[in-house]
Amino acid sequence: MSKKKTSRQTRTATKQNMNQRAPVTTMDAFSNPAARIGFGTMDLLQATEYPMTRMTQNYQLLTSLYRENWIIQNIIATIPNDMIRKWYDLKTSIAPQYLKEMVQLERKTQIRKKLLLGMYWGRLYGGAAGVILIKGQNDLSMPLDMDTVMPGSFLGLHILDRWNGIYPEGELVTDAEDPDFSLPAYYTIRNDETGTMVARVHHSRVIRFIGRELPWMEMVTEQYWGESEIEAIYDELVRRDNVAGNIAALTFRANINYQETDGLDQLLGASNTEIQRRFWNTMAAQSMMESNFGTRLINKGDAIHNTQYTFTGLPDVYDRVMMDVAGAARTPVTKLFGRSPAGLNATGEADLQNYYDYIDGLRETELRGIIERLLPVMALSAWGKMPDDMDIDFSPMQTPDAKDIADI
């Protein structure tokens, strides 16, 4: 083998070793420095940042928004109300005449209202819990014992939000067959005023309500709760409130009169305060007479002009802002703002159909698990036994009418 060939092979092997020792990471991006567009340039878009705010942890702000802003109240309440509105259909071999006992138990314990409150505060604060209360099971730190659930012993749910004294502990459920696998095994109920522990609750007695789902590490940061619905909507809400406020402020300038007065600069710049006082008294008297009689007296040689502001285009701007808020809230404009659809021949039926499909999905993924967790306890309390074939079903939120069926 020649020296030249050997040298070439040596250099090739050396390059391969260098590549193995020092891998080079490459990134693809668009950049046009001459036009100042793209990655690494002085482009205005490149200056955009998305800082981590974690607004869910700001209890004061969330509470203030909920109490003072009607849009926030609608965002928190609309979806839970629709999820609960048609309730569920119970499928079981129990005779129909006994089903009213379950209905009476639901009314007695106000289970619908308690679930609504849990969903409200879970969506507002990112987390809430409903503690299952059973007569005779006073030690809440023990797992829920179905064998000791007697007829009439189910007392309902006690709803606590994440800032109202219930705190997940660090120990997690390790049983992979448990529905609460990888979630806290115990919750501490504490009196925040005194700092004393009221109760330690086993996870089998807790119904969890969370806002928006978070990745695992972010959920740990939020103490195993979720994200407030308001955090993803806040920026759009600020834009809407400012647009509405500015439009309202413009109404005060819709019709403005202004007066031309000769020598006004010398008059205002005069050092004689008596002259200035007389001038302001004259202007005040003119304004009062105009307000009372619709007439304004001016000096000979003065002139009065009127300007009117046109609001053309502002309704379109406001509509676009409302659409952004509705999109962030996952709720149609017609339901969130209580207004009819804008535009020629607009009915909003397509938006409502998509929304109701979304609600049907939430009932299956979120509400079903909650009800199936409560049903065994409620059945034992209402009937004294748990039917083996008991199941639930949800009626569609929107069913086709006669016209829709005929069109099909």
Language-model region placement:
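Conserved aromatic-histidine-acidic binding/catalytic patches
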Residues: 27, 47, 54, 63, ...
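Surface-exposed polar/charged interaction patches
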Residues: 21, 36, 68, 72, ...
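N-terminal-proximal low-complexity accessory segments that begin disordered
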Residues: 1-85
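Exposed alpha-helical structural elements
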Residues: 25, 61, 70-71, 83, ...
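Extended, charged amphipathic alpha-helical segments
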Residues: 200-347, 395-397, 401
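C-terminal amphipathic alpha-helical
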Residues: 111-131, 268-283, 310-407
